[in-house]
Structures are given as structure tokens and as C-alpha cells.
């Protein structure tokens, strides 16, 4: 069996930390975008944290958003490009801390976007500080 990554996924190294799930999740996301036939009609919105590194490992269309503002940005992209598959891709810190109100209100408005939240239980891009999803007793750089 000869397996090959879709052309949407560039070959080579990524900037993700060893053991980080973003690379795997990103690859699965873009493999599915290709499988569904949306490679020419998809936009992925990422924030400034770790997920923004996906922009450098794919040939997909991206929009960068401020930290925690992925969902309102994705909502605007969807309104401008109604026929596109719009994916909001961000981490738990962005979704459940600074962007929590956007998470709630996007759900209430029933926005027609795909939302992916990667829960690594810390603010990873800034060194592993506690996040709203940090487990009790979990060691972080900002834990007591």
C-alpha cells in the first residue's frame, strides 16, 4: 500500500513541540478537507497561539485572529464567503479563557462554522502556564 499525504499538506518539519498533538490534529483536519472536496473552498481561522504554526505546514487558506478572537473572525469569514467551509481552530486557553464569551455566543447564534478546540490543559505558546482546563494537581510553570 502506498500512502501519500494530500498536496494541501506540505512535507517537512513543523515547529510544534515534541509530543504536541497539533501536528496530528492539523493533518487529520486537512486530510478531511481534501476528502470532502473543499481544498479550493475552505478557510481556516487560527489565533496567535500554537495553532498559528499550522499556517507554515499547509498550502491551505488561513486567516489569523487575535488571541481568543477566532470565533468572531470565523463568523465574519463565513458571512463573506457563504459557500466556503470555515474552520475555527484554537486551543483551550483561547476558547475557554479570553474567548469564552465568543465560544458561548457562537453556539447560541448557531454559527455555521466548524470549531476545533485543542485541549492541552495549559497555555502552551507562552511556556505552559495554567489554563482554565488545567487539572487539579497538574504541574505547570505557574502552579503553586
Regions found by a protein language model. Give the residues of each.
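Hydrophobic/aromatic-lined pockets within catalytic cores
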Residues: 34, 108-111, 130
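Thiamine diphosphate
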Residues: 50-144
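Flexible, glycine/proline-enriched loop segments at strand-loop-helix junctions
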Residues: 15-19, 90-93, 138-144
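Solvent-exposed, flexible loop/coil residues
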Residues: 20, 75, 100, 127-129, ...
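N-terminal low-complexity, intrinsically disordered patches enriched in charged
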Residues: 28-30, 85, 133
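Active-site diphosphate/adenylate-binding microenvironment
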Residues: 2-66
Amino acid at each position: 500500500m502506498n500512502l501519500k499525504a494530500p498536496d494541501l499538506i506540505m512535507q517537512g518539519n513543523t515547529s510544534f513541540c515534541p509530543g504536541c498533538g497539533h501536528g496530528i490534529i492539523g493533518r487529520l483536519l486537512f486530510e478531511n478537507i481534501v476528502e470532502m472536496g473543499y481544498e479550493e473552498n475552505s478557510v481556516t481561522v487560527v489565533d496567535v497561539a500554537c495553532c498559528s504554526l499550522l499556517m507554515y505546514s499547509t498550502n491551505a487558506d488561513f486567516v489569523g485572529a487575535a488571541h481568543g478572537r477566532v470565533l468572531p473572525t470565523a463568523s465574519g469569514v463565513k458571512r463573506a464567503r457563504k459557500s466556503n467551509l470555515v474552520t475555527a481552530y484554537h486551543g483551550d486557553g483561547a476558547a475557554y479563557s479570553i474567548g469564552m464569551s465568543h465560544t458561548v455566543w457562537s453556539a447560541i447564534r448557531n454559527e455555521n462554522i466548524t470549531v476545533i478546540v485543542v485541549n492541552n490543559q495549559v497555555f502552551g505558546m507562552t511556556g505552559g502556564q495554567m489554563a482554565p482546563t488545567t487539572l487539579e494537581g497538574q504541574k505547570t510553570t505557574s502552579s503553586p
